[in-house]
Amino acid sequence: MMMRCVNGQTAQDHLVTQLPGLSGNIGVKSYTGYLLANATRGRYLFYWFFESMRNPSQDPLVMWTNGGPGCSSLGGEASEHGLFLVNADGATITRNPYSWNRVSNILYIEQPVGVGFSYSNSTDDYQNLNDVQAASDMNNALRDFLTRFPQFIGRETYLAGESYGGVYVPTTAYNIVEGNGKGQQPYVNLVGILVGNGVTDAEADSNSIPPMMKYHSLISIKYYEEGYKACQGDFYANQNLPACQKFLTDSSNAMGNINPYYIYDSCPWLGINLQQKLKTTQEMTFQVLDPKTQQPVKIHPLFQMYKHGGWSKRVANERNFAPRFETDAPCVPNQSIAKYFRRLDVQQALGVRRKTADPNGWNICTGIINYTQVYSTILPFYAKLLPHIRILVYSGDTDMVVNGLGTQAAIDKLQLQETSSWRTWEFDSALGTVVGGYIRKFEKSGKGLTFITVRGAGHMVPLVKPDSAFYMFKNFIDGTCC
């Protein structure tokens, strides 16, 4: 039997007391370790936990995941809303004045297995990952965390994530709700979820990309109209028609080497020289299943840019060379983050006990996993969750990859009652009161779904607009917004 310490954690958990590159003490209690996700297969998910700086004994517990699939949640900690942000030199870190642990106890989990420091004793798992297994593993890992830290049993709990987290978060939330109903222990007091620029519904998400390109002058109105005709009014359904496919490919190539995750920015660190150095014929396998036949379907790369291989394909097609094997999130200055977490002294400080599953070492996104997208739409999960929890869906409005137009179209499919129509939301910044974005509210069975845009933000909202993101997050978990 594992001996339990007085403050709740077990001998499996590592108290982080210092971090290389940090000037001064950490300042909060922080733990790392490996959470049991599946006992039969021996799957373990690495986590990094930070106590709240406000009131750790009362503030909610928030579990965060990044997307990919295959991208590490430590990237969210180190570049978005974590307490410590990795500097460009990859050697030093800076305290983040807008860290989300200022008002919450936050748990970053690297998942699925094969990502970051997470691993499986059954190594064939890395080639057989999917949405169903990921949700089950996250549910189990969270309950294992509560077992180790029983002070959070019964505490208000939120799940949060971005990008492919739009699949991870709702599916995991429903797995938790079902588990609670079946008596799975310990009980998780799940009260809400937050999804940022999240993959939601394949049809709505995909059909919004060409209009987004038109509205932001990335393609001409005339060419858009020609493409709309070639695709017979439905870009997603008719993407494999030769004329439609040509329009999608040509539109994709016409953008040039911009950053589709933040369209008013360039993508210098995904330059052609770097691509040519790293090119290979191999790339991560990612299958999408047809919901009716459960057979793999062919999806155009323009509709798969949220997957870190999709952008590679687009640039490769444009420049007429083989796509690179993506081992990092495109258009994010992440090499500094990889450099930091690959350091032996950093891994020792974090209590890392074994090598990464990725032979290349820790990467912000791994290329070793094969992942199958089981759900082409997450809307049924939203419908099932609404009677139980609050939902916040937020969208940086300069992201083309998973943009707010598609997210709104997806939400409208739920046919919810709109309780508050489109209006601004504001917050106090260093410049005074500013418009943070726009908001719509919906309701079903007494629980609410709120859609928020974050003005000027991209795919990873806290990366570009940390102040807006913190205000939105704080007010949602405090119940003063949405």
Swiss-Prot record:
Active site (UniProt): 163, 399, 459
Keywords, alphabetical: Carboxypeptidase, Hydrolase, Protease
Pfam hit, one: Peptidase_S10
Keyword Hydrolase listed: yes
EC nos: 3.4.16.-
PROSITE patterns, per the entry: CARBOXYPEPT_SER_HIS, CARBOXYPEPT_SER_SER
Enzyme class: hydrolase
Domain of life of the organism encoding this protein: Eukaryota
One GO BP annotation of this record: proteolysis
Induction: By growth on mammalian cells.
Matches recorded under InterPro entries: AB_hydrolase_fold, Peptidase_S10, Ser_caboxypep_his_AS, Ser_caboxypep_ser_AS
Recorded GO MF terms: serine-type carboxypeptidase activity
Entry similarity comment: Belongs to the peptidase S10 family.
Function of the protein: May be required but is not sufficient for increased virulence.
PANTHER family: CARBOXYPEPTIDASE, SERINE PROTEASE FAMILY S10 SERINE CARBOXYPEPTIDASE
Name of the protein: Virulence-related protein Nf314
Source organism (scientific name): Naegleria fowleri (Brain eating amoeba)
